[in-house]
Structures are given as structure tokens and as C-alpha cells.
């Protein structure tokens, strides 16, 4: 695709040429006489937009106020002038007129700073800039759905055990370990994404989007090019991009955030190339902000225009100059994650090989392209930006990206237009898991997880993010713990995010131990992934004064993956001995029962039994012990919830009897 950008300062164009232009930006002086008040944002921001600001400690300020209605009313009185859209962030108005006298009238208004042309009548002759727009190649793929539907375990990459049967696009998710998030249930639910593009042809009937349509998760659409509420009949490019995220055809193609919500905006006119498209983008971003959107995925970019006078030289792609870049950075300032394709000009032999706008923005995540093996795509635009800032930020699969075609079947395409939404969807899933973190905190963790974070370069940026690594890093950030020790009793308290399917393993290492010994197993508490608090008391049955005891807490997130959350060391102050005592852990219990029997004498005929309240024996152990401590673990998976009796005998003499309670899982 062709990527372009335009300076917010367009007054360098010859004043004498203004008559040939059809659209202009009117820069306003202030927002005087505004009917809206910062103190009452409910009149111009949705509840979700206000909540986003509150969660991220973002103040509502004058840039949030709409353009003054009184100024718009005055501009509308000028003959031959139509208002197309406005930007409250930039305090400007986009108008349509070819009348020089009307422009002169507007420029004479006291509240107007300047007017600048941004569009002209399209030149009917062929133009290389337009011809290179949306030049990604699309290649049909064989349909794997019959194979995969017969065998859910047979994935396109040979992988097994995932909750989603991805089909053809598994590899472009697996390169980021994105399936790790999906397997935990994080599929973009409750995250709203806005797509900016040239159109979404046929999305209302495409089978790839059946789920998102039936569940009413396309929240709205708007065409800022034609000022109409439909994007279904325009260019196909946006549909391809959307399919990498929102498709849900198991065995053929499943997107990276198949349960997210979406707004679809047309801001790009594929038939021409003028800076008006950047103003459209700004207006759409502001609409998205007001509507409470969480993320923007934009597969557009600007550096060259039909009229070279609008071009942005490399030093102007500095993150602070282009209209669209300023708007994109402002969107990030309002708490949204802004994702944008880096550009497809990496093979250019001049300065246009560097990232376009708004990918040059300081707070914009510019996404380059690799293949599924992690090799950089030659077409992927280079960094840094014009100010020397690292770009692209990250990379994803943009060469051979699996997409949905017009009938919902899997096809393949090349371009950073596709690498961007592919990873944007995974970032949405990560944010779903950790919504308490700000947009920039999430991006920071994504970048830190990338494979070249410590050695970034101008092709990969920080590299290929790993979402398992990012998840564990955020889990660590959410974790808190404390330890206290009194005599031979150590109390460990902690707070961490979990679900019932997760488990904590507390381990201990005494100086006499060769390795860590499991002390306790605690299951997660809630169905939803949220913060829960735990406490465990460990009573030591051996140990000497000044001996150091190391505790380690692990969280099993899945059956085969765990993370060490906490390690701490305590020092004993007295001799610890069990004596003739019985310690049972845990009680109540959900899984195995672990107990320690202390005895000062040998037990020649040890008998351990577990019975229900009706006296039925459910478990029995017989053996003998030497003086000291005897350890035993009793499996209880087959037991129902209820009360049980643990009895320990020496021959027929009862040494200990303890009531135990099993809780439901």
C-alpha cells in the first residue's frame, strides 16, 4: 500500500493556487462561547470515554471540547461553503469550496487563524502515487476446513491442544504465542477496536464475519469521505484487514481477537491522494474517542501525494509535524492504543523508504512486516523516523498473511497493512486480561516481550512480541506479597490475578534439603480472571536457631506452564520440633490431603484410615515408622464434597482422630 502524510502547517502552498483546490482546513483561534463545559463531559463524551480517562488518570481539558458551534454557524453563512467535518483536538474545520471570495471572507473572520488547501479535483490522468495505493498481493489458499473439522487437534502448523481450531492462520498467531492468551479465554472480549481504512466491501454478508454480526459486535460504521453512514460498498482493503482480527471460521481462519467489538470508519479515498484524508482520519479518531473506543487499528499512511507540494520530506516525518500524526498522538494521549502500519516502501531507493505518517508518531505503535519464520519482509518500511526515534516499534506477520476473501475463504496477502491488525488483535486480548493498566503500560510490556528488545534495529524495531512473556510480566506487576515469622510459624500472604483453573504451589527449602519441597497447593478462587488474596501458615517441624529457610511461590497458569512469583528467606530464632503431634494440610481441602505425624517412639503397626461419616473406609495405609516425622499424602480426587474422619492408630490404639472437610472445586 502507498503511505502518505501531510504537515499541519500547509500555508507554504502558493496563495495564488488556492482557487484550484476544493477543500480547505480552517484553523480556529479558540473555542469561545462554547455551549459545552469541561465540568460536564457527559454532553460530549460517552460514559465509556469518561471511564477510560478516569481509569488512566487523564484529565478532561479544552481539547476535549467540541469546536464552538457559534463559529460553525458563522462559517455556514458564507455562500458556496459546506462544512465536511471538524477536529476538536486540532480546533479546525474542514470545508468544501472553490470560491476564492468565500475563502477571503472566512480568512477575514476574527476567530480564524488561517485557511489551508487539502484537496483538489482529481486528475483523470494516471498517477504513480495513486497506482501504488493498496498494492498488496492477494493469493488464494487451499481450504483446510474439511481436514481440521474432522480432527480438532490437527492445526495448520502441526500444533495441538488449543481451544481454537485456527486452520490456515495458526502460524501467524503462534509466532507471538498468541494462542496462549486464547487458551486462557482472552479473545478480545469487552475491548472495542476502531478500524480506519478505505472501505470494508461486503463485510455485511461475508461469512467470515457471521459471528461478529450475529452478536451485534460491529457497533457502528461511518464514511468520512462521503459523509454517509455506510462503509460496506467501498474499497475491499479494510475488509481484508478486519478479517485478520474478527474472522471466526474454525478450521479455516480465526482472527486474533474474534470476540472484540468494532467500529468501522472510511477515511481514505482510494481513487486519489490528498491531505484531506488525514483530516478525515483525525475526525474519525475523535469520533472513536467520544464513543469509548479502546484501540485504533489503522492500515493507512501518508508520505507522497498527487501534488508533490503536499509531500512530507523525511525530516518532516518526525512525529510532530503531520496533521494525522498529531491527531494519532492525541488519540494515545486520550488513553487509546493507536496501532498503525509502518509502510510498504522499504525497497524505495530514497528517503521515502522510511516510515510514513502517522507511524512516525511518538505514541503510535508502528508495525513492520515479517514472514511466519520471522524474516523481515523486504517491502517493510525502515526506521528511524525523521527525528531519529526508533521505528518500527514491533513487527508481525505481513508477508503471506492469511486473510479472508470476499466469500470468507482463506487467502493470503502481503503488506504491513496486514501485519498491523494481526498483532493489534493480540494486544486487545492482552488488554482484556489486564484492563487495569494504561494504554502505554500495555504497549511497554508488549515491546519488552519482543525478541530484539535489548538490541533493537531500524528494520525490526524491538522485534517480534511474545504474548506469553508479556502476560507473565503483567502478572508479576499485579502480584504483591508479605511474609511474617513468629517462632516456628511462618505466615505468607499474597494477592495475585487468577481463575479457578489456576493453582499456587508453595515450596520450602531448609538448609538440610537438597531442593525445594512442596508445602501446600492452593487453587484459584474465582471464575473470572481477577485479583484474589491468599494466606498460608507454615508450621515448621524441624529447624535450629539462625537456620535460614527459603520459601518459593509458583503460580500454575496452565497445566504445563508456571511462573515463580515470589521468593523470600526467613531466619529461625528457636528450635522447631513436631513432637507427638499431627499436622494436616490443608483443611478444608479440595485436592490431596498432606499430613505429618510426629512421634518420639517407633510405631511398629501404623494404620492410617479415612472414613466417611457413615463409617465406610475410603482409604487405608498400613506400615511402620521410626522415631521422628512421618509424611503421607492421601489422594482425594474421587471424594465428594463433605466431612470425613482421619484416624491414625498404633495397632488398635488411636493416636489421633481428626475431622476433615472437602470443599467443592
Descriptions of predicted regions:
Residues 5, 18, 502-533, 541-585, ...:
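C-terminal outer-membrane/trafficking sorting elements
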Residues 83-87, 99-103, 127-195, 205, ...:
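N-terminal domain-start motif of subtilase-like serine proteases
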Residues 182, 187-189, 248-251, 264-363, ...:
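Substrate-binding/access-modulating region of protease and related hydrolase catalytic domains
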Residues 211-216, 369-421:
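Catalytic-core environment of secreted peptidases
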Amino acid at each position: 500500500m502507498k503511505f502518505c502524510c501531510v504537515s499541519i502547517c500547509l500555508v507554504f502552498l502558493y496563495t495564488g493556487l488556492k482557487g484550484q483546490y476544493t477543500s480547505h482546513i480552517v484553523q480556529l483561534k479558540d473555542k469561545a462561547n462554547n455551549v459545552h463545559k469541561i465540568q460536564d463531559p457527559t454532553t460530549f463524551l460517552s460514559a465509556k470515554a469518561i471511564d477510560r480517562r478516569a481509569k488512566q488518570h487523564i484529565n478532561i481539558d479544552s481539547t476535549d471540547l467540541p469546536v464552538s458551534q457559534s463559529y460553525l454557524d458563522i462559517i455556514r453563512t458564507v455562500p458556496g461553503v459546506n462544512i465536511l467535518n471538524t477536529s476538536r483536538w486540532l480546533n479546525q474545520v474542514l470545508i468544501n469550496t472553490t470560491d476564492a471570495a468565500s475563502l477571503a471572507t472566512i480568512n477575514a473572520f476574527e476567530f480564524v487563524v488561517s485557511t489551508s488547501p487539502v484537496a483538489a479535483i482529481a486528475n483523470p490522468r494516471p498517477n504513480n502515487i495513486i497506482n501504488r495505493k493498496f498494492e498488496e498481493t492477494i493469493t488464494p489458499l487451499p481450504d483446510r476446513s474439511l481436514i481440521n473439522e474432522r480432527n480438532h487437534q490437527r492445526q495448520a502448523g502441526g500444533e495441538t491442544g488449543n481451544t481454537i481450531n485456527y486452520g490456515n492462520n495458526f502460524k501467524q498467531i503462534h509466532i507471538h504465542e498468541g494462542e496462549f492468551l486464547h487458551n486462557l479465554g482472552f479473545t478480545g472480549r469487552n475491548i472495542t477496536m476502531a478500524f480506519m481504512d478505505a472501505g470494508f466491501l461486503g463485510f455485511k454478508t461475508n461469512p467470515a464475519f457471521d459471528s461478529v454480526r450475529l452478536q451485534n459486535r460491529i457497533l457502528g460504521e461511518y464514511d468520512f469521505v462521503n459523509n454517509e453512514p455506510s462503509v460496506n460498498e467501498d474499497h475491499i482493503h479494510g475488509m481484508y484487514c478486519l478479517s485478520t482480527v474478527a474472522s471466526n471460521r474454525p478450521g479455516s481462519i480465526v482472527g486474533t481477537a474474534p470476540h472484540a467489538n468494532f467500529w468501522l470508519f472510511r477515511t481514505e479515498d482510494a481513487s486519489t491522494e490528498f491531505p484531506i484524508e488525514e483530516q478525515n482520519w483525525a475526525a474519525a479518531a475523535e469520533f472513536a474517542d467520544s464513543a469509548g473506543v479502546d484501540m485504533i487499528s489503522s492500515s493507512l499512511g501518508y508520505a507522497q501525494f498527487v501534488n508533490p507540494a503536499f509531500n512530507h520530506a523525511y525530516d518532516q516525518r518526525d512525529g510532530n509535524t503531520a496533521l494525522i500524526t498529531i491527531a494519532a498522538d492525541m488519540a494515545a494521549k486520550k488513553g487509546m492504543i493507536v496501532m498503525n502500519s509502518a509502510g510498504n516502501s522499504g525497497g524505495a531507493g530514497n528517503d521515502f523508504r522510511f516510515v510514513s505518517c502517522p507511524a512516525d508518531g511518538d505514541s503510535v505503535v508502528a508495525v513492520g512486516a515479517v514472514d511466519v519464520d520471522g524474516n523481515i519482509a523486504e517491502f517493510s518500511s525502515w526506521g528511524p523516523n525523521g527525528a531519529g526515534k526508533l521505528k518500527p516499534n514491533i513487527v508481525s506477520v505481513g508477508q503471506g498473511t492469511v486473510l479472508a476473501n470476499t466469500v470468507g475463504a482463506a487467502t493470503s496477502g502481503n503488506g504491513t497493512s496486514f501485519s498491523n491488525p494481526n498483532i493489534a488483535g493480540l494486544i486487545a486480548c492482552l488488554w482484556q486480561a489486564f484492563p487495569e493498566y494504561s494504554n502505554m503500560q500495555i504497549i511497554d510490556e508488549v515491546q519488552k516481550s519482543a525478541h530484539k528488545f535489548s538490541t533493537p534495529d531500524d528494520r525490526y524495531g524491538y522485534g517480534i512480541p511474545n504474548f506469553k512473556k508479556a502476560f507473565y510480566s503483567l502478572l508479576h506487576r499485579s502480584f504483591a506479597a508479605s511474609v511474617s515469622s513468629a517462632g516456628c510459624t511462618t505466615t505468607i500472604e499474597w494477592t495475585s490475578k487468577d481463575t479457578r483453573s489456576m493453582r499456587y504451589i508453595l515450596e520450602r527449602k531448609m538448609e538440610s534439603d537438597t531442593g525445594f519441597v512442596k508445602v501446600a497447593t492452593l487453587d484459584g478462587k474465582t471464575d473470572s480472571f481477577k485479583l484474589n488474596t491468599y494466606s498460608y501458615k507454615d508450621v515448621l517441624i524441624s529447624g535450629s536457631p539462625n537456620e535460614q529457610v527459603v520459601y518459593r511461590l509458583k503460580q500454575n497458569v496452565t497445566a504445563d506452564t508456571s511462573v515463580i512469583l515470589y521468593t523470600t528467606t526467613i531466619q529461625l530464632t528457636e528450635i522447631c520440633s513436631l513432637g507427638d503431634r499431627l499436622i494436616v494440610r490443608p483443611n478444608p481441602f479440595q485436592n490431596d490431603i498432606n499430613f505429618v505425624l510426629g512421634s518420639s517412639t517407633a510405631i511398629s503397626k501404623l494404620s492410617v484410615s479415612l472414613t466417611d461419616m457413615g463409617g465406610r473406609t475410603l482409604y487405608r495405609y498400613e506400615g511402620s515408622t521410626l522415631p521422628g516425622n512421618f509424611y503421607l499424602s492421601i489422594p482425594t480426587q474421587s471424594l465428594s464434597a463433605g466431612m470425613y474422619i482421619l484416624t491414625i492408630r498404633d495397632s488398635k490404639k488411636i493416636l489421633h482422630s481428626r475431622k476433615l472437610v472437602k470443599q467443592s472445586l
